[in-house]
């Protein structure tokens, strides 16, 4: 059984309220942190090996250490709660049921970074959660954990909740900052990075909800103890949003030492696939990471078990692996159509493109049109090659990662399921009434000729 750090008290009735949260050890980590020097907390976070839980997996302590500290210039912490990645909902769970865990993490993080004004930028579709957060903020303020001279330390902190307007692109940190400043959420060119020139041109750290919440157990048990949980550079625990064709969808906390097979089939987690269906494929890190077929999901190309951690999921690169991403674990059974699924994702990314970069603005539209054509039984064999060519023109040629996020699902679908795409082209009428089923996987590593 995985060790619980973030969700250990999630089952307790009323845990979202200050009194109950406090009764079960809440804000003890904050009290401990406020007696430490900011640089000591930073070292604990570095020692813990905590990596950003929003998708990129960049070391949190290192990111904090980049924060510029010019004399007399305010600094800010911004929590990225614009959780809009299809298949990802773990941050929503934290904010809805454990809002004080996030606020405590923000208090510790803001104290470490020297931010006296911090923000939570929340996805517009989470319309009911800002009220929960604002109530928790008022409770914390009434108890002396927010506001002026917190616990007599001389440290001041105000936290504000800002609602987004439903744009996926605002999950990109610089687009988020643009929106927070009241402008259209278009990503900025980097450098300068937010740590140097962020919100209102001030040094700013932007972190994911789960990343900030994880600071609380790091201070509770110490960075060294936190680093012992997990394996290698995948330290601590990770929240996984499990959905799709599984018996037990939901949010699970894992310590990243379990195998993918155990996560899917164990009763402790997903509980297997309904109705005894076969596993066809999985997207383990949210819609933007490469889809992998069952034969490469449960084992690596070398035949070793694949584990639920950053390194193991990425084993083999994009040729045979994928990414941990945001932890949006989407399972597809044998009845699912990969062409239809890829088309749905392409439609999403085309709709959510901000339009600033031509490769993304035009490319996502054309990928959706071609996939729709193939899915309707009107495609030609050259359309598959055209799709491949378009995604190559998008990847790496945009200001922000949305272009890559749109290209990777298409590339992986063609790489691993080309036979299914060809079946749609060769069987236009049949493809409208039945699905292809389990793919006839080709060897993803073609043999190299010695001639």
Name every feature range the model reports, one short phrase each.
Residues 105-109, 256-274:
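Short amphipathic, charge-patterned alpha-helical segments
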Residues 47-67, 166-178, 182-184, 350-362, ...:
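Conserved phosphate/anionic-ligand binding catalytic regions in large, soluble enzymes, centered on
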Residues 56, 62-64, 88-91, 130-135, ...:
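Short acidic, glycine/serine/threonine-rich loops at helix termini
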């Amino acid at each position: 059984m995985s060790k619980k750090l973030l969700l250990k008290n999630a089952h307790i009735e009323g845990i979202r309220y200050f009194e109950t949260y406090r009764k079960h050890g809440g804000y003890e980590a904050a009290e401990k942190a406020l007696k430490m020097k900011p640089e000591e907390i930073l070292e604990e976070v570095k020692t813990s090996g905590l990596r950003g839980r929003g998708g990129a997996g960049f070391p949190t302590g290192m990111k904090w250490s980049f924060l510029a500290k010019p004399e007399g210039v305010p600094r800010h912490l911004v929590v990225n709660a614009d959780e809009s990645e299809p298949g990802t909902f773990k941050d929503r769970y934290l904010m809805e049921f454990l809002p004080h865990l996030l606020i405590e993490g923000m208090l510790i993080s803001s104290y470490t970074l020297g931010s006296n004004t911090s923000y939570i930028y929340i996805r517009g579709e989470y319309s009911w959660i800002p009220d929960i957060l604002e109530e928790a903020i008022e409770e914390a303020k009434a108890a002396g954990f927010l506001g002026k001279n917190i616990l007599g330390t001389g440290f001041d902190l105000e936290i504000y909740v800002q609602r987004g307007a439903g744009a996926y692109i605002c999950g990109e940190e610089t687009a988020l900052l643009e929106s927070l400043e009241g402008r259209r959420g278009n990503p900025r060119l980097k450098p300068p990075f937010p740590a140097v020139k962020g919100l209102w041109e001030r040094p700013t750290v932007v972190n994911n909800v789960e990343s900030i919440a994880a600071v609380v157990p790091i201070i509770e048990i110490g960075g060294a103890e936190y680093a012992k949980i997990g394996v290698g550079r995948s330290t601590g625990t990770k929240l996984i949003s499990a959905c799709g064709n599984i018996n037990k969808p939901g949010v699970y906390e894992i310590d990243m030492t379990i195998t993918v097979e155990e996560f899917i089939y164990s009763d402790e987690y997903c509980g297997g696939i309904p109705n005894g269906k076969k596993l066809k494929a999985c997207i383990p890190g949210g819609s933007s990471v490469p889809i992998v077929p069952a034969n490469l999901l449960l084992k690596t190309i070398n035949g070793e078990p694949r584990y639920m951690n950053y390194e193991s999921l990425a084993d083999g690169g994009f040729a045979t692996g994928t990414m941990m991403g945001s932890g949006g674990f989407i399972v597809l059974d044998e009845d699912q159509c990969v062409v239809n699924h890829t088309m749905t994702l392409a439609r999403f990314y085309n709709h959510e493109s901000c339009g600033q970069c031509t490769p993304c603005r035009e490319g996502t539209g054309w990928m959706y049109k071609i996939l729709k054509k193939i899915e309707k039984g009107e495609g030609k064999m050259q359309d598959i090659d055209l799709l491949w060519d378009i995604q190559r023109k998008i990847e790496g040629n945009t200001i922000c990662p949305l272009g890559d996020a749109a290209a990777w699902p298409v590339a992986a679908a063609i790489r691993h399921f080309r036979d299914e795409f060809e079946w749609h082209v060769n069987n236009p009428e049949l493809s409208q009434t039945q699905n292809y089923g389990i793919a006839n996987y080709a060897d993803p590593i073609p043999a190299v000729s010695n001639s």
